[in-house]
């Protein structure tokens, strides 16, 4: 067991949930309406907000690759869209970059499926500028359509097409650990399963496997973004959980802290030299509850196995003199958190634990230097 290096007193939260859900049927979904979105009592005061792109390259494509919408010519590909909010009075606080997981977009960090405040706004209210990218090939970052149009034109074999990934509602329940099977929530489950249809609406086609170059351009874009911000805390989730590590290896000076939320992997392949580089940056790994739930995806390791792989990585980094911690809410009596921990009913309680870690292990360390 990896010992904790920081302590926060938090009361246990045990929430019983009874769910009557019909999963896997076609037809209209339960619609969220504007009145379901909760408005905080205090205003959100911003110094700035906006959006921009990081990276990208200009390529020339044929008329057919462009879908026959006018002549061939040049377009931009592999750019990363970023939306940001900067709080009034937050000067000097470290920016936080939040990266979404597979088949999702930056929406993961915004208003929760049941209409509560998301981590993007909450971190801003706590004084941190927040930057929310859409991974290259996803959402407003777009994808390179030429690989599909070439197949349609017969110039590329169909087998060369990227795989389009999506999670079904049925698959999300065990893999995201809302319950052991669709419609059967754990008694202490923290995810708002009554709004699970709203989570389904957040899903988008994902061409990460074969639809983006190798290495994934998002990795360098994150490193470049952190550099443009003169240093930032990088936070990844699920598929992107290891992205902050990879960005830190590109430019450790720009990554002031790394937060890995339920990472899909904590790679064991890192060399001693890479571990020494990662040991220069404070790292926090965050996992939820019920990790022994069968994911329903035999080709992937269980969440408990991933948890143990992250413990092993933490051990290697500490042995190299680094600061690395595991935030495991069940150790603190906080039960029932899901894979979508940033959307759980106690999401702000978990956010406070992360914010305290950033303050103690990143901001104060930066100030001391």
Regions found by a protein language model. Give the residues of each.
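Conserved alpha/beta-hydrolase
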Residues: 116-141
């Amino acid at each position: 067991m990896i010992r904790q290096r920081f302590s926060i007193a938090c009361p246990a939260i045990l929430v019983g949930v009874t769910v009557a859900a019909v999963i896997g049927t076609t037809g209209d979904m339960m619609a969220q309406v504007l009145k379901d979105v909760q408005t905080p009592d205090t205003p959100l005061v911003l110094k700035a907000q906006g959006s921009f792109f990081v990276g990208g390259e200009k390529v020339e494509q044929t008329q057919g690759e462009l879908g026959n919408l006018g002549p061939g010519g040049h377009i931009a590909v592999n750019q990363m869209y970023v939306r940001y909010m900067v709080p009034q009075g937050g000067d000097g606080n470290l920016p936080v970059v939040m990266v979404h997981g597979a088949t999702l977009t930056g929406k993961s960090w915004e208003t929760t499926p049941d209409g509560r405040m998301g981590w993007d706004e909450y971190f801003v209210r706590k004084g941190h500028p927040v930057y929310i990218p859409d991974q290259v090939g996803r959402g407003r970052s777009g994808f390179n359509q030429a690989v599909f149009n070439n197949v349609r034109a017969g110039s590329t074999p169909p087998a060369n097409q990227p795989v389009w990934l999506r999670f079904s509602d049925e698959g999300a329940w065990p893999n995201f650990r809302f319950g052991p099977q669709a419609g059967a929530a754990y008694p202490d489950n923290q995810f708002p399963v009554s709004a699970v249809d709203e989570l389904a609406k957040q899903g988008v086609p994902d061409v990460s496997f074969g639809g983006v170059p190798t290495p994934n351009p998002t990795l360098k874009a994150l490193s470049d973004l952190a550099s443009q911000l003169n240093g930032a805390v990088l936070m990844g989730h699920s598929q992107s959980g290891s992205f902050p590590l990879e960005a830190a290896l590109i430019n450790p000076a720009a990554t002031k802290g790394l937060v890995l939320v339920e990472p899909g992997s904590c790679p064991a392949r890192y060399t001693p030299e890479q571990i020494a580089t990662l040991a220069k940056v404070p790292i926090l790994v965050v996992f939820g509850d019920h990790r022994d739930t069968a994911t329903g995806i035999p080709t992937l390791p269980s969440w408990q196995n991933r948890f143990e792989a992250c413990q092993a990585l933490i051990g290697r980094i500490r042995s190299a003199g680094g600061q690395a911690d595991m935030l495991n809410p069940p150790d603190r009596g906080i039960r029932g958190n899901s894979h979508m921990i940033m959307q759980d009913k106690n999401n702000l309680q978990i956010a406070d634990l992360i914010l305290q870690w950033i303050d103690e292990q990143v901001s104060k360390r930066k100030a001391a230097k």
